[in-house]
Amino acid sequence: VYKRQASTCYHYISHIYRQFAEPNLGIAFASLLPCPWLYHDLGKALNRKPSPNPLYQQWIETYITDELEQQIKEEEALVNQLYRESDETDKQKMLEAFHRSVHMEAKFWEMAYQHQTWTSDLQSLEKEKK
């Protein structure tokens, strides 16, 4: 059964797609950087007390590898290089795309915690109208 993604998920994905419409790919790359960065940091924090659930621990270990850390460093270096090569307008767009993605990452985790669905969003709107 297909369930529509929650509005937060839709909004985050739409944000990323919009950045790829920009002529400067640095803007799109800046919008992508927060996701692996956050997952890596979160994985390291969660691994301080390993999970007794093997499946969950495997998920954690996916995000704490040296390979992922190296990949993130390379992505960060690329984004920084593209930032240096950009004009002031695009630099501002890169910062905005990065910050919006950081915000959307937080909303994405909140969405999962709250078990948000498109239907629950609509129900919340209906309650606000009353």
Regions found by a protein language model. Give the residues of each.
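Short, small-residue-biased leader/transition segments that mark boundaries at the very start
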Residues: 1-2
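Acidic/His metal-coordination segments adjacent to aromatic residues that form catalytic metal sites
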Residues: 9-28, 56-59, 86-91
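Long, hydrophobic, amphipathic alpha-helical segments used as structural scaffolds
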Residues: 20, 24, 43-50, 109-116
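Secondary-structure transition/capping residues
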Residues: 27, 47, 86, 116, ...
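Aromatic-enriched hydrophobic runs in primary sequence
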Residues: 10-16, 36-38, 44, 123-124
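An amphipathic alpha-helical core segment
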Residues: 32-107
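Acidic, carboxylate-rich catalytic segments that either coordinate divalent cations
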Residues: 94-130
